């Protein structure tokens, strides 16, 4: 299967499909023509340019007032990529690095960056052959683009750095020799076009949004099972309630729960309690707010991944080369912080339902186990969930609220969007684990409602889950069961 890089809108759903299917990339004629046209314009412009052009004939950052001789312009770009590869910390997961390659190609394909066609084609070759550069999580301020991580992404183009290839971390020069690829000699502006961009942030955001859709759906399914296990009421999910407060996510969540629980014997039973705790009764409002946030963030990120985000921007048709700020990550840093909060809240309310299920209420045994005291049962999984939720709350401090000046004050406001991106991924992972622990608890609790049955949908999930995680009669080693639960919803 092949995906043609074009100027048609690239959606996150398309990205999800092409990554899952192992799709190959191919540069479309429209994109190829735009890249060639821009490079030819820039080459011609360089012949008689009468003024300094930032990053093309000058140094970078606060060194922008230093003019570089024509014979050194290629070396300038080579030096830029080498000197900016200053990332550190943990490495970025390979699937996100692959996303970075895709998004960098997409951004360069519009023909506003001045890169050589061979440079873009090599990025495509790397994507298609799963030659994935080693990129580090720390180092980007999220303005002037993701300089350090994109430098690591592009080092292999010039024969430097390391790559993941066939399960091994190797020197890119060795892999290049094996594949018969030659290092690329960068031309004027190319290094800046490669490094000035938001693809580190955007790739993390796209990956997180793909996971967010999955986790939001599981939050509803697991929440519905917990509602059944807790002998909760269906009335808070009636459509009349949500018609008078018409937030889309709230309406969708309530409708989803009604469908999930359709035909349940448990939900139809007469309830002796007047109302449920907020963690059950307010699921439509809380889960719905997260859905609305996911929807909004997706709309913003889809604009970003269909944009040219480097600097300066080259406009061949208008005979313009403009130094501006499309590299600044603020437009996506704030939404990523919002998404972090939205996903953290899914885990926050999930942990509260876990707590209720083990509290010995509504006919459920203490800690969901026979012989409490002799057995601790599901006591400690709730501790684990609480620990994870607390960590996620700490990660909800908006990275985009911070800014530290750099480059001798020339770059005096930055987005810190890369920090928003990496902590977003951490919260995605945390939320997945908390929801898995809730599923672990909910299936155990549901057993105590027998012989009554839940809905066909919930019972189907229950039956599939029981194939990998058994009912707990007496205390046992639970870590492997929690890990199996995580794998189940993954």
Question: What role is predicted for each listed range?
Answer:
Residues 72-85, 356-366:
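Catalytic or ion-translocation cores adjacent to nucleophile or general acid/base/metal-coordination motifs
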Residues 2-23, 27-34, 38-41, 46-49, ...:
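C-terminal auxiliary extensions adjacent to catalytic cores
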Residues 2-50, 77-136, 227, 242:
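Glycine-rich, flexible loop motifs
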Residues 72-75, 119, 212-214:
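Short, low-complexity, polar/charged sequence segments that are solvent-exposed and flexible
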Residues 135-140, 317-321:
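Cysteine-centered functional microenvironments
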Residues 112, 141-143, 373:
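Conserved, non-catalytic sequence blocks in retroelement Pol enzymes and Pol-derived host proteins
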Residues 54-68, 72-76, 83-108, 136-158, ...:
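FAD-binding core of FAD-dependent oxidoreductases
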């Amino acid at each position: 299967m092949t995906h043609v890089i074009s100027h048609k809108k690239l959606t996150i759903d398309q990205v999800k499909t092409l990554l899952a299917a192992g799709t190959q990339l191919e540069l479309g004629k429209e994109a190829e023509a735009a890249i060639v046209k821009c490079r030819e314009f820039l080459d011609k412009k360089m012949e008689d340019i009468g003024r300094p052009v930032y990053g093309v004939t000058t140094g970078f950052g606060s060194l922008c007032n230093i003019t570089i001789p024509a014979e050194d312009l290629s070396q300038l770009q080579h030096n830029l990529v080498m000197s900016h590869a200053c990332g550190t910390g943990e490495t970025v997961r390979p699937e996100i690095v692959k996303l970075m390659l895709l998004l960098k190609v997409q951004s360069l394909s519009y023909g506003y960056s001045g890169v050589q066609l061979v440079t873009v084609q090599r990025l495509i070759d790397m994507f298609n052959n799963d030659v994935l550069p080693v990129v580090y999580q720390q180092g980007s301020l999220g303005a002037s683009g993701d300089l350090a991580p994109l430098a690591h992404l592009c080092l292999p183009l010039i024969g430097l750095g390391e790559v993941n290839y066939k399960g091994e971390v190797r020197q890119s020069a060795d892999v290049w020799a094996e594949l018969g690829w030659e290092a690329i000699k960068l031309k004027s502006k190319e290094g800046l076009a490669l490094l000035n961009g938001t693809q580190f942030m955007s790739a993390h955001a796209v990956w997180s949004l793909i996971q967010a859709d999955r986790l939001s759906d599981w939050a509803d399914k697991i929440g519905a099972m917990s509602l059944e296990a807790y002998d909760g009421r269906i009335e808070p999910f009636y459509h009349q309630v949500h018609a008078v407060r018409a937030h889309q996510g709230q309406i969708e969540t309530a409708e989803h729960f009604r469908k999930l629980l359709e035909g349940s014997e448990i939900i139809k039973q007469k309830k002796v309690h007047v109302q449920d705790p907020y963690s059950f009764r307010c699921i439509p409002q809380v889960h719905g707010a997260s859905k609305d946030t996911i929807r909004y963030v997706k709309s913003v990120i889809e604009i970003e991944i269909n944009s040219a985000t480097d600097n300066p921007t080259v406009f061949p048709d208008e005979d313009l080369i403009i130094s501006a700020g499309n590299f600044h990550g603020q437009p996506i840093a704030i939404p990523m912080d919002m998404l972090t909060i939205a996903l953290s809240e899914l885990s926050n309310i999930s942990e509260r339902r876990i707590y209720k299920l083990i509290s010995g209420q509504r006919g459920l045994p203490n800690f969901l186990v026979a012989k409490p005291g002799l057995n601790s049962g599901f006591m400690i999984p709730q501790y684990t969930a609480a620990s994870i939720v607390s960590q996620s709350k700490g990660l909800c401090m908006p990275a985009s609220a911070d800014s530290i000046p750099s480059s001798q004050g020339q770059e005096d406001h930055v987005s810190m969007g890369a920090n928003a991106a990496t902590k977003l991924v951490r919260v995605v992972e945390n939320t997945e684990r908390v929801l898995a622990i809730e599923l672990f608890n909910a299936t155990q609790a549901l057993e105590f409602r027998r012989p009554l049955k839940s809905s066909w949908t919930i019972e189907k999930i229950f039956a599939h889950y029981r194939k990998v995680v058994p009912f707990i009669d007496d205390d046992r080693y639970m870590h492997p069961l929690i890990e199996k639960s995580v794998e189940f919803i993954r």
